[in-house]
Amino acid sequence: MNQRTVVLDRVMLASLVWGDVDDTDRPLAVLLHGFPDTAHTWRHLGPALAEAGYRVVAPFTRGYAPSAIPEDGSYHVPALMHDALALHQEYDGDDRAVLVGHDWGAITANGIAASAANPFRTVVAMAVPPLPTMYPRRGDVGRWLRILPRQAALSWYTLFNQLPRLPERSFDRLVAHLWRRWSPGYDPAEDLAHLAEALPDDEHKAAALGYYRAQSRRRQLPHPYRSLAADWLAEPEVPLLYLQGADDGALDPRWADRIGDRLPAGSVVAVIEGAGHFLQLERPDVVNARVLEFFGASR
């Protein structure tokens, strides 16, 4: 594992890399982390993909050190999509490239999967499915209503993170609580240490919280990202692998049961037993095998 830094047109991003990222004979794999997490979340999948012949780039997404806090202050999903697309270009990706995202990274990846600007062959989303697949539909409203109350209770933190100053002041306690609730039985000590390095002060913590706050301020989306604004709420157009932990404490696992027939042909949905929200860390053997199998089948 090494670290590479690139200056994109809107922000500087540092990434963990595996494999020879300058060897364009290898297909590119871009891995996007979520909240409250860092690029180190890919410490199992990254080496597995490199061993399978990929060159792997896992950025610390905007606002997470050592990446920069963006000057435009945007943490809107289209801005995150823009960064991932820019990484594909910066690292000379081609139509063999693949994209993997977890949590906010999954929201970003799902948006790219729905975009006409998508250069990736296929996409893996973990822990958050494409948002349109979660909407109610005819004949499914009853099941949707049965999931909704529990999901609303699980998602309390999304409203808490909208508050001014309080989330920053209680940030360390909040994220430790979320890790333990979202992935019961998993020891997050190493991941929380990485997170403390990535978000060392209130400015960086506000950046991480900005991902949530930006969604209630969509009219403030900077102009360079507006061409992607509708995509993250659209249905994916390329085959997608969706993975969710059976014990996920952030997103009710029952969502996985109702989305398969709303994904493009060639897509796969799998619930990982013995894993919660951070399934790539809890069951890396199973997750790595699922991802590699899907990438092989979609070639």
PLM regions: where:
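Alpha/beta-hydrolase active-site loop signature
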Residues: P36, T61-A65, P130, G276-L279
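Short beta-strand element of the alpha/beta-hydrolase
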Residues: D25-H33
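The serine-hydrolase catalytic nucleophile loop
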Residues: F35-L45
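Catalytic histidine-centered segment of alpha/beta-hydrolase-like enzymes
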Residues: A275-P284, N288
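Catalytic histidine neighborhood in serine/cysteine hydrolases
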Residues: P253, R262-H277
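A short, Lys/Arg-enriched amphipathic alpha-helix followed by its capping loop at the start of a domain
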Residues: L45-Y54
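Conserved alpha/beta-hydrolase "nucleophile elbow" surrounding the catalytic nucleophile
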Residues: H33-F35, G101-H102
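Flexible "cap/lid" subdomain of the alpha/beta-hydrolase fold that forms the substrate-access gate
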Residues: M1, R10-L13, V21, L28, ...
